[in-house]
Amino acid sequence: MAKFKRKYTLGEEIFNSVSHGIGAGLSIAGTVVLIVTAAIHTNAWGVVSSCIYGASLIILYTMSTLYHSFTNEKVKAFFRIMDHNTIFLLIAGTYTPITLYYLNGVTGWILFGIVWASAIFGIVMNSINLEKARIPSIFCYIGMGWVIVFAIKPLMEHMPSISGIFLIIGGIFYTVGIIFYAIKKVKYFHSIWHLFTVAGSVFHYFAILLGFFRI
C-alpha cells in the first residue's frame, strides 16, 4: 500500500468528516423512506433497486467520514482507497433505479451493464494504484455520470418532468464539484467538494423518490 501523505489541515478534516457524517445519517433515513415508498408505489424492481441505491449512498458517506476522521497513517491510507472506490459505487448505485425501474427493458439493462462494468473497472484501477488512477478516474466519473444523455428520451417517457429536472441539477452539482475535488492545493476546496456532493445526492435522491409517486 502506498504511503499516505497528509494533505488537509485539522480544520478541513473536521469539516470533511462532519459534513459527510451528516450525509451518512441522512442517507440511512432517506434509504428507509425510499424503500418503504418503493414497496407501496412501485414493483419488485423499484424495491430492489432502491436497496442497492440506498446502500451505495450509505457506504459512500460512511467511508468518506471514516477516511477524514482517522489520523493513523496506515488506516487513513486504506480508507482513502475506499473513499475513492465508493464514488464509482455511488454512480452505479444511482443508475440502478434509473435503469432497472424507470428505463427497464433492453435500453435499461444495457446502460445498467455499461455503468456497473465501468464502476468495477474503476474500483480495480484505484485499488491497484490510486495515485496513477486519479486523473483517469475523474474522467470516468464524468463519463459515467453523463452517459444517461444517450437514453434521455426514453427515460423522460417513464419519469415525471420534475424528476428529470432534479436529475440534471444533481448532475451539474456533481460535475462542478469535481473542479474543487481536482484542485488539491487550495485550502478548503475539498470541503467545498463535499458540499457539492451532498447537494448532488439530495437532488438525485428526490429525482428518484418523487418519480415513485407517478401513476
Where are the language model's segments positioned?
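Multi-pass alpha-helical transmembrane bundles in non-GPCR membrane proteins
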Residues: M1-I215
